[in-house]
Amino acid sequence: EEQINYLDVYVNKLQDFQNKAYNYIIEKLKEKYPLLQEKKQGIQYTMMDGPLQILNIAYPHEELLSEDYLNKDIEKELYGKKGLRRVMKYNKTTKKEFEYKESTLEKFGRIFSSNGDEPLLKKYSAKIYKFIQKVKESDGICLIYSNFIGGGCVPIALALEEMGIYRLNSNRSLFKTKPQQPYKINGNNAKYIMITGDKKLSPNNKEELKAATDPNNLNGEKVKVIIISKAGSEGLDFKNIRQVHILEPWYNLNRADQTIGRGVRKKSHCQLPFNQRTVEVYLHASDLQESQLESIDLYMYRVAENKAIKIGQVTRLLKENAIDCLLNKNQQQMNSSNIGKNITLQLSNKKTIDYQIGHKDNSLICDFMECNYLCKPNNDLSQDIGIETYNQNYIIMNIEKILNKIKLLFKEHYIYEKSEL
């Protein structure tokens, strides 16, 4: 059976309750869709919604602690918006003024708290708990992405507020009463922002984005944590991000790659010292207590990697046979094997590593193959060739003429032989 071969996935071990909730959801899905029990049967994404959100956070439910819990019909009360409503009370109009329900405090305690020797958050969300630990250990700004609101962005925000990191605009903080003293960074109160497609949760994305990219926010002095969802994050560019966390996978790697691209841009880290221009990427996944079983998020990463490998094979063929392949051979000099230089970098947790500069074999940018490849045909270009038209100045001066000529040619034919060109 195929395995995850190239992706470096950050695996979190589930605690008893979350593991039990996940297994319960899977059993209910098998009852509803018997074909899932067949080994070769694929899984539709709509079926994965519940299991994926459970692996983000499983909201506690006393029915799940009973002996006959498999006979209970409580699937949707364990995750997402319904699960959140069951354990918390809040103003549904403004989506603020969050408070624990008395029944939640009596039976389970402050479930979003990461404090103490036995933090409650760890029982219900291995991923969010680990993210909180990474925030505490890190210098610089942390970016976290989730596709879900009630099962992702909101519980992340509540967990941050439980540790004392509040919303940039204090009027937008979720808890009605601040549960902790402010968490300090270099003497400043640590803040977070949340950029989503929900206007109630994120009424002023521009203001929060401006604060996050402010030159004075070099190490998270103004905004320590940025929470984003798919709907709210498209087209955004951040600066000086030191950690990127992807809370759950998607069926292909494009979404994760786009999210990483929000924090890794050209000149996005120029304000930082050279040895601190690092971005750590965490692709969060789950390790079940039944270690022989594969969690749904690991399954999705495996499927996504397999797709990416096949796409890479096609991409490599296009590169090898591209009309400008020989002209762009110098691009391959960006590979780590060709550069052959190591530098010492400091991670966000202040640990240092030796890093080899350049593109790596079997990475996305190298099509999950060796980075070096030969053009087809691989002609020798050592003889004198006029390159006066192969430069930026020529393109700038002549781009309109060239485009018009191409359009006219396509009006006549859409296929031309080399001799005609």
Task: Give short role names for the model-derived ranges.
Residues 1-225, 230-421:
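Helicase-associated low-complexity regulatory tails and linkers flanking the ATPase motor
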